[in-house]
Amino acid sequence: MSSLQAMKTLSLVLLVALLSMERAQGLRCYRCLAVLEGASCSVVSCPFLDGVCVSQKVSVFGSKVRGENKLSLLSCQKDVGFPLLKLTSAVVDSQISCCKGDLCNAVVLAASSPWALCVQLLLSLGSVFLWALL
């Protein structure tokens, strides 16, 4: 085997190894809590072997107050309630979507409301409930 063939073989093996390492790191998801318009999210590797990326859109009082959580979970939990909000008679709509592709939870929900601080609190509570389901 000539040194040129050996170099080509070594390069091919190295390329395959590098491509495999990227996939071995697992699913990558956006992660942020209480996202409002213009906020950015960090990219994290999902710690779960067969996890999912999650995007939770929350609107309070109809569409006046809106925001979003993004994270990774072990499995898709579509039925997340807000038990503390039942005491306040707030109308809360939560939509959860799950996906399994890298950075697939990228869609950001726009927000335009003076109730932004209220949404941040509600979204933080919603994300705590999501994590508690694990």
Curated annotation (Swiss-Prot):
This is Lymphocyte antigen 6S. A lipid is attached at residue 105 (GPI-anchor amidated asparagine). It comes from Homo sapiens. It is found in: Cell membrane. Disulfide bonds join 29-53, 32-41, 76-98, 99-104. The keyword Membrane applies. Residues 106-134 form a propeptide. The gene is LY6S. InterPro entries: CD59_antigen_CS (IPR018363), LY6_UPA_recep-like (IPR016054), LY6H/LY6L_nAChR_modulators (IPR051445), Snake_toxin-like_sf (IPR045860). One of its GO terms (cellular component) is plasma membrane. GO terms for molecular function: acetylcholine receptor binding; acetylcholine receptor inhibitor activity. Keywords: Cell membrane, Disulfide bond, Glycoprotein, GPI-anchor, Lipoprotein, Membrane, Signal. PROSITE patterns: LY6_UPAR. GO terms for biological process: acetylcholine receptor signaling pathway. Pfam families: UPAR_LY6.
